[in-house]
Curated annotation (Swiss-Prot):
Gene Ontology annotations of biological process type: cell wall organization; peptidoglycan biosynthetic process; regulation of cell shape
Protein name: D-alanine--D-alanine ligase B
Known catalytic reactions: 2 D-alanine + ATP = D-alanyl-D-alanine + ADP + phosphate + H(+)
Protein's organism: Bradyrhizobium diazoefficiens (strain JCM 10833 / BCRC 13528 / IAM 13628 / NBRC 14792 / USDA 110)
GO MF term (any one): metal ion binding
Transmembrane segments: none
Length: 376
């Protein structure tokens, strides 16, 4: 692999994949771990990889193995001593240096693979930059990314489409709701409080009293100016489904998996997901009646379409007896060694290497369809 755009082989030129990771987000560390796993999964006979690390303050760096990244790493690193680079608008993947001889050539990429979780990466911001650069990229475009990232907007769209969602309300930093009003509106004193635009359970907590609610809101407002308050579902099972869009536009759902958290964790928190090795178990396939499992797969595809997702998404559900609720869709799901999205496809017969090929093929096909549109 090379840091700057790859080399020509005698037989054919490899595809240069720009792997974007890190980011200005509370999910920065998760992104670095996801990127390491994707780097291992990409077929080195087919792809050269241009590692683009985005620092916590939003700067882009050209990273290579000398900066601590590599196929044996559990998480890729970003050195602020690496060359700082930028993507050229309309440049079809061309990159330039932003330090030293500013504007000098820094190579190019054929396709971008943004594995950026949370704000400033999963919310349509980077997708907009990639569209302006006129380069193919993996995953949803601006609309689907922005819609799925905002929990309030996505839940309203799903509810309006007749999809089952958990009762919720939103509150903002400028018009905060009191605990008593939230209890009255949602019909229960047992509530979950979440930042509206974040994932990986960052900033999420449970509240069963006025004091806990105040603390939960204070925590969530550290990460977002809008927060979601949801009715807690006691005893609900957490079921997940991976959705993949082929280059032809065909959409299919994987088999289902279940998250079974350890008893000491009150819910599937960031700690349970990424810190505690025994925080949760992944059961694949999920033990569900056949008809219910098929219904969840159908719902996952419906959610994918309603939220304008493209390429891939992981759709999460709550199952309480015969009742099913859609929790959310993640347009850039985790790709760590313990992440459900790639594991579900592996269990469905699609290896991670083949999954990478399909995601990249979709990126190229979607870009060609977009370029065929008239903008004049």
């Amino acid at each position: 692999m090379t840091a700057y755009g790859g080399e020509m082989t005698k037989e054919r030129r490899k595809i240069t994949v720009g792997l974007l990771f890190g980011g200005r987000s509370a999910e920065h560390e998760v992104s670095r771990a996801s990127a390491a796993n994707i780097l291992r999964a990409l077929n080195s006979d087919r792809y050269d990889v241009y590692l683009i690390g985005i620092s916590r303050d939003g700067r882009w760096f050209a990273c290579d193995s000398g900066n601590g990244a590599g196929t044996g790493s559990t998480a890729l690193t970003i050195s602020d001593e690496a060359p700082e680079i930028g993507l050229v608008p309309g440049g079809r993947g061309r990159l330039v240096h932003c330090d030293g001889p500013t504007g000098s050539d820094a190579g190019s990429i054929d396709v971008a693979f943004p594995i950026l979780h949370g704000p400033n990466g999963e919310d349509g911001t980077v997708q907009g930059a990639l569209e302006l650069a006129d380069v193919s990229f993996v995953g949803s475009s601006v609309t689907g990314s922005a819609v799925a990232m905002d929990k309030e907007v996505s839940k309203r769209l799903m509810r309006d489409a007749g999809l089952p969602v958990v009762p919720f309300l939103t509150t903002t930093a400028s018009s905060r709701i009191e605990y008593a009003a939230a209890v009255a509106a949602l019909g229960t004193p047992d509530l979950f409080v979440k930042p509206a635009n974040l994932g990986s359970s960052v900033g999420v907590s449970r509240a069963r009293s006025e004091e806990e609610f105040a603390a939960s809101c204070a925590l969530a407002f550290r990460y977002d100016r809008k927060i979601l308050v949801e009715q807690a579902l006691n005893g609900a099972r957490e079921i997940e489904c991976s959705v993949l869009e082929e280059s032809t536009g065909d959409i299919r759902a994987s088999g289902l998996g279940e998250i079974v958290r350890a008893s000491e964790h009150g819910f599937y928190s960031y700690q349970a997901k990424y810190i505690d090795a025994d925080g949760a178990a992944l059961h694949i396939p999920a033990d569900l009646p056949l008809l219910q499992a098929r219904r969840l797969q159908e719902l996952a595809v419906e959610v994918f379409n309603v939220l304008c997702c493209e390429g891939m998404a992981r759709v999460d559900f709550f199952v309480q007896g015969d009742e099913v609720f859609v929790n959310e869709a993640n347009t850039l799901p985790g790709f760590t060694s313990s992440s459900m999205y790639p594991k579900l496809w592996e269990a469905s017969g699609l290896s991670q290497t083949d999954l990478m090929d399909k995601l990249i093929a979709h990126a190229f096909a979607r870009h060609e369809r977009r370029r065929a549109l008239s903008f004049g």
